[in-house]
Regions:
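Rossmann-fold dehydrogenase core element
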Residues: 107-117
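Short, low-complexity disordered leader/linker segments with a strong preference
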Residues: 1-9, 33-37
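Beta-alpha junction/loop-to-helix N-cap segments that form part of ligand/metal-binding clefts
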Residues: 46-105
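Structural motif
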Residues: 41-63, 173-187
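Conserved small/polar residues in nucleotide/adenosyl-binding loops
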Residues: 198-200
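Extracytoplasmic "Venus flytrap"
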Residues: 8-29, 43-53, 148-151
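Stable alpha-helical elements in mature extracytoplasmic
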Residues: 20, 24-28, 53-57, 72-76, ...
Length: 200
């Protein structure tokens, strides 16, 4: 709850400009402005796709003594979690908090000063969709970025779901934009269906 007339400063760290991330940030700003009209100022920073910039941005927020940090994307969340155990942190556009924060025995609650929302889709539904749309498919290529922990996590989960349906899977990992085209071609050559699990 907010004290009548109190003002709050919120630092927003967004990994990269992207329509989905931009919408999440704007929705957060709109919701706080609606809940606390005229009481919140925002410092909205974009890391330009560089995870190291997230650390610099968040450390700046900590030095300024912001009241809340909103971390938009996994790199922003991990930077915020490393920077402070005191300032409340809200994450958004995070697929798997347990993976992002390297938590053993994650039960769905981070605890401490961290909370937020997840964008994790139901992976069993994705497996169901593949068998519904491509009933003759025998092999599925799982395309993902090896540098993104959320993608790796989802690959493992969806591979299990597809194996339970008797479908063979093979992982095709790329490291960055330099090898994505060749890896994607290899995946297409191997499989009846290519499932891309790429995150920001």
């Amino acid at each position: 709850s907010s004290a009548e007339g109190a003002t709050y400063k919120v630092g927003i760290c967004q990994l990269v400009q992207h329509p989905a991330l931009d919408a999440a940030t704007q929705g957060f700003i709109d919701a706080l402005n609606e809940a606390l009209p005229g009481q919140v100022t925002f410092e909205n920073k974009n890391a330009s796709g560089e995870a190291n910039n997230c650390g610099t941005i968040v450390n700046g927020f900590v030095s300024e003594g912001v009241d809340l940090i909103m971390a938009n994307a996994t790199a922003a969340l991990t930077a915020a979690a490393s920077a402070t155990a005191d300032i409340p942190i809200l994450g958004t556009s995070i697929t798997a908090y347990g993976v992002a924060l390297d938590l053993d025995d994650f039960d769905g609650t981070v605890g401490g000063n961290i909370s937020g929302t997840s964008d994790l889709a139901d992976l069993s539904q994705q497996a169901d969709m593949i068998t519904e749309w491509f009933p003759e498919a025998k092999k599925v290529a799982l395309l993902f970025c090896s540098a993104e922990p959320n993608s790796s996590y989802q690959i493992q989960e969806v591979a299990t779901c597809l194996a339970n349906k008797g479908i063979e899977t093979k992982e095709f990992a790329f490291t960055d934009s330099n090898d994505v085209a060749s890896v994607t071609q290899s995946a297409a050559d191997y499989a009846d269906v290519v499932l891309s699990l790429i995150h920001i």
